[in-house]
């Protein structure tokens, strides 16, 4: 009974080492890219900004930040049951996302070292930050008697290939939405310390600045490649990646609304705020942004959430697998239709939006 409280419902590779969460469309992805194409990029158009960002990376503002203090040195067995399960899942998803960034940035730093030294050093220093984050999160998991085998994760995950342009879109949004997620949680718990169930949240203010600087780096890279931002295809891809990132976060978080409730947040309100701020931030580099203030945007996402719950119910039923397939088809079609309608919603011209904001 004690073990079930400490490790509620988690499979283990070996004692204390958790089996990684099953890969789905909603789990953090591991990426690879065309390293030669990236090495050939001419960054001279925006090299001054990239060099300034490199100096910030070298300064390493957070080199003494990720140090566990006395508040961690206690038993956390009072966090049990569903709260414990949800919190471990939160730590695992966060650790996996940070570690995937580490692997990508480390490989880019290695591959670009001789051909594009400025980018190579930036990627190496960002991989340093991501490794710190992943290690800190994995150590936090050990407070709950579990951890991830990051070496096993490296070898067992499928890697998604993206051309450099798409890597930049995806990682820029990942870093910027990470900033808004962390700082929003930090500010909420700063105002409501009674909801801070675990000390890791105290670290989020400085932590999120790493995410912000990384996002600024990808902003600067894209601005060094104007062809990535200035044609009609850039507008279509901007819409695609914005919608993909927002929909993935929304479906993940609403499914785990009980976790956010444990720290005093309403998951839907939290996501609406984070999406709004990330969308505004993306307008500084993307040619278009989404109309996330339209009621239709969340009405359609909420239908996707309902469909996701239906799919989970079908998958966990005793219905034979071949019948489950046919039961899922109309639900999947409905989700696909909602996402298509969201993609086709009229976007907002980012230049006009920035002008209105000023």
UniProtKB/Swiss-Prot annotation:
Biological pathway: Porphyrin-containing compound metabolism; chlorophyll biosynthesis (light-independent)
Any one Pfam family match given in the protein's UniProt record, by short name: Rubrerythrin
Entry keyword set: Chlorophyll biosynthesis, Iron, Metal-binding, NADP, Oxidoreductase, Photosynthesis
Gene Ontology MF annotations: iron ion binding; magnesium-protoporphyrin IX monomethyl ester (oxidative) cyclase activity
EC supergroup of this enzyme: oxidoreductase
Enzyme Commission no: 1.14.13.81
Name listed for the protein in its UniProt record: Magnesium-protoporphyrin IX monomethyl ester [oxidative] cyclase 3
């Amino acid at each position: 009974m004690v073990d079930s409280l400490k490790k509620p419902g988690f499979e283990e590779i070996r004692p204390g080492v958790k089996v990684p969460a099953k890969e789905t469309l909603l789990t953090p992805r591991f990426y690879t890219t065309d390293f030669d194409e990236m090495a050939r990029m001419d960054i001279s158009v925006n090299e001054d900004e990239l060099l300034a960002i490199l100096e910030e990376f070298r300064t390493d503002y957070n080199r003494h930040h990720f140090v566990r203090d006395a508040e961690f040195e206690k038993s956390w067995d009072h966090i049990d049951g569903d709260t414990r399960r949800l919190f471990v899942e939160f730590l695992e998803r966060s650790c996996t996302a940070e570690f995937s960034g580490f692997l990508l940035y480390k490989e880019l730093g290695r591959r670009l070292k001789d051909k594009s030294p400025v980018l190579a050093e930036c990627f190496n220093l960002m991989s340093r930050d991501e490794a710190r984050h992943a290690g800190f999160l994995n150590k936090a998991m050990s407070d709950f008697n579990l951890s991830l085998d990051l070496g096993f994760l490296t070898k067992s995950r499928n890697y998604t290939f993206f051309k450099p342009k798409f890597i930049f879109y995806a990682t820029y949004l990942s870093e910027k939405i990470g900033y808004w997620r962390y700082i929003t949680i930090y500010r909420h718990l700063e105002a409501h310390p009674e909801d801070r169930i675990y000390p890791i949240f105290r670290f989020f203010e400085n932590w999120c600045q790493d995410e912000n600087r990384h996002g600024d780096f990808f902003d600067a890279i894209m601005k060094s490649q104007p062809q990535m931002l200035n044609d009609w295809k850039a507008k279509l891809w901007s819409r695609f990646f914005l919608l993909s990132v927002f929909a993935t976060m929304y479906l993940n978080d609403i499914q785990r609304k009980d976790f956010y409730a444990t720290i005093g947040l309403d998951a839907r309100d939290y996501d609406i705020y984070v999406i709004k701020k990330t969308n505004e931030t993306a307008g500084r580099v993307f040619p278009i942004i989404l109309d996330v203030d339209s009621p239709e945007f969340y009405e359609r996402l909420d239908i996707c959430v309902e469909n996701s719950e239906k799919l989970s119910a079908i998958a966990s039923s005793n219905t034979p697998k071949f019948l489950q397939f046919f039961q899922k088809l109309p639900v999947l079609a409905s989700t696909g239709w909602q996402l298509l309608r969201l993609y086709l919603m009229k976007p907002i011209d980012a230049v006009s939006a920035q002008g209105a904001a000023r």
